[in-house]
Amino acid sequence: RLYEGDKLKDIYTTPFGIRSIEIIPDKGFFLNGKRTVFKGVCNHHDLGPLGAAVNDAAIRRQIRILKDMGCNAIRTSHNMPAPELIRACDEMGMMIMAESFDEWNVAKCKNGYNLLFDEWAEKDLVNLLHNFRNNPSVVMWCIGNEVPNQWNEGDCKIAKWLQDICHREDPTRPVTQGMDAPDAVVNNNFAAVMDVAGFNYRPFKYKINYKKLPQRIVLGSETASTVSSRGVYKFPVERKAMAKYDDHQASSYDVEHCGWSNLPEDDFIQHEDLPYCIGEFVWTGFDYLGEPTPYYTDWPSHSSLF
């Protein structure tokens, strides 16, 4: 309540929760004092045929399905989440990695956020932090996804600038980003400046990169990208990358993946065997419109197979 003298001027109500989070080098992520591995998924904000408009019942349905299969975390790929999602995760017990940007000041696409980054990045990031820093389900901030800046010498300064904003507005949570150029980022300090080094794909690089990281912690910020079509089985059953068929489907045996990705067990092995791996966020929790890999130009393919 805000008073001017004895006169009530404003009332603000905010939900909150009490829990502890800690990341210990070489040992992992601890939630309420217990070592916890992220068994997460990346999820776009759209709700399939319902579209991108927020639907509380549909959001909660997705969370129930994810929890039923053993998922304990969602990465909001690749944008700031709706308040309805965060509230539902608070109530239903799902951890959140809240992501902010898919692009900084180097373009992924001609008419992208790069045109607005210099003016709006701090304002937009502060808005995210202020909106959700009281929500217990949010356990980590993510400041970027596969940004082209990761290749540039010196752009680790931008990463540190964004991370410092997160620390300034919320000193209680670690900060990460999803990086898909593991060799570049460990050699140009792009990964070293982060609280948590998040790697997209290439789990076979974890052991190599761990030795070069001062944090001594590795996160699979985006993993797998295995493709499959429900009820479709291809023979012979063999592992394939970017396999294409006349029916524009993929085998439901989960043995097919993209050129840059791998099968789920490739990631599972790393996170089960390596104590410094704190878990992963599989691509993707639910199918979405767009990216019909490997059928990019094959009409009428328009939905993802991940």
PLM regions: where:
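Extended substrate-binding grooves/exosites of carbohydrate-active enzymes
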Residues: 9-306
